[in-house]
A protein has these predicted regions:
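Active-site-proximal alpha-helical
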Residues: 258-342
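Beta/coil-rich, acidic/histidine-enriched accessory regions frequently appended to metallopeptidases
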Residues: 42, 46-49, 53-61, 105, ...
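Solvent-exposed, acidic/flexible segments
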Residues: 92, 96-103, 188-200, 210, ...
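Zinc-dependent metallopeptidase catalytic helix centered on the HExxH motif
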Residues: 165-265
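Non-catalytic architectural context of zinc metalloproteases
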Residues: 25-197, 215-216, 224, 342
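Sec-exported extracytoplasmic/periplasmic mature domains
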Residues: 108-116, 204-213, 239-247, 305-313, ...
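C-terminal motif of bacterial Sec signal peptides marking the signal peptidase cleavage site
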Residues: 16-17
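Sec-dependent signal peptide recognition
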Residues: 2-8
Length: 368
């Protein structure tokens, strides 16, 4: 299955950015200059820059663990290590056993691939408002026990009750590093046919944040461990992969990302990492929806796929992400992919600027 995924990614990205067989929609045949052969085309330059992204001969996670000599509370508590204790689940009474099982299945799939991190408790909300209030209180007692009343009346407790009021099937994760002992959790509303995928997505956030600790490196204001686009993009990519929906999702996401770039040429994933830019984007609509959502999910997924295509699925999730604990987000990215985050932003912007037909026939899907 992993081989099939990588083959699909390679084929997909080659069709979009590297194939000489795909014709431009709007481009006019360029005039050949006398020294044309001496000047690499923009496409050739892009291909060479993409090749810069590669697996490096850096120290393994085991070497980094052995060399890490800075006292760290979360590392000493095993925050970044798999646990034997199984996740717990709380569910409102109006939901069925099938709803519970779909969420349990998603978490099980996530832990099977990534390992069992936590301690984790999952809260599943239906449409009964009184039931949601009960589970909201339970959530606050677990995840915000240092400030339960505030959580219930002014913070996430309200969000949980609103899931019942509006019958939302969204989710959110909470990472309570500051508690003694620390714990993790996520909340899901009204499980439907996408429940398994959503549960995996939220569990990926649990895994990501298990490797983000309070250390010297994240005292830097601009180093949050994972850029927003990579945090959401990598969660969605792995969730789609594990439920077998990556091909269609990648094709759709690339279309959306390219249209977004065409209509908003001065907006990119790098703007998500600037707080002032982020506040502006949160008030702006793009492609009929929120700019931030498109950049984090569809565009972030394509960017993540490009990194995975140049390395591997296991390398991305099981080598790169764990290194964040010991190196911080910026250094872990650079060490893992042979390129800085800012350099990747430049390459990815050029990738989206390529004006090619992007398509993938159903016949080719079936053949793969």
């Amino acid at each position: 299955m992993l081989y099939k995924f990588l083959f699909t990614l390679i084929s997909f990205l080659m069709i979009i950015s590297c194939s000489d067989e795909v014709e431009s929609v709007t481009s006019v045949e360029p005039k050949v200059e006398p020294n044309f052969s001496e000047k690499p085309s923009p496409k050739a330059k892009l291909k060479e820059r993409i090749k810069e992204i590669k697996i490096t001969e850096s120290k393994s996670i085991y070497d980094l663990e052995n060399e890490y000599d800075t006292s760290n509370r979360l590392i000493e508590l095993g925050w970044n290590k798999p646990l034997e204790k199984s996740p717990e689940f709380a569910i409102t009474d109006d939901l069925s056993l099938a709803a519970l099982n779909s969420v349990v299945e998603g978490v099980s799939i996530g832990t099977e691939y990534l390992g069992n991190y936590g301690p984790l408790k999952v809260f599943i909300i239906g449409s009964d408002i009184d039931g949601a209030k009960i589970v909201a209180k339970e959530f606050c007692e677990w995840a915000r026990k240092d400030n339960i009343e505030y959580c219930i009346n002014k913070d996430q407790g309200i969000d949980i009750v609103e899931m019942a009021i509006y019958k939302g099937n969204n989710g959110f994760a909470q990472h309570s590093r500051h508690l003694e002992p620390p714990n993790q959790s996520f909340v899901m509303g009204n499980p439907d046919k996408s429940a398994v995928k959503i549960a995996i997505h939220e569990y990926v956030h649990i895994y990501q944040n298990a490797h983000i600790v309070d250390g010297w490196w994240n005292d830097k204001e601009d180093d949050v461990g994972l850029p927003r686009w990579l945090e959401e993009g990598s969660a969605e990519i792995l969730a789609r992969y594990l439920v077998g929906d990556y091909a269609d999702y990648l094709r759709e996401s690339l279309n959306i990302a390219k249209y977004f770039k065409r209509d908003n040429p001065n907006i990119s994933i790098r703007n998500l990492e600037n707080e002032e830019d982020l506040r502006i984007l949160e008030k702006k609509d793009c492609l009929g929806g929120h700019c931030v959502g498109t950049l984090q999910y569809e565009t972030g997924a394509v960017a993540t796929a490009l990194l995975i295509n140049q390395t591997s699925m296991d390398y991305f999730y099981k080598e790169y992400i764990p290194k964040i604990t010991y190196l911080g987000g910026e250094k872990a990215f650079e060490i893992s992919f042979n390129i800085t985050i800012n350099e990747f932003h430049e390459i990815f912007d050029s990738f989206l600027d390529e004006d090619h037909v992007f398509f993938w026939s159903k016949k080719k899907d079936k053949e793969k």
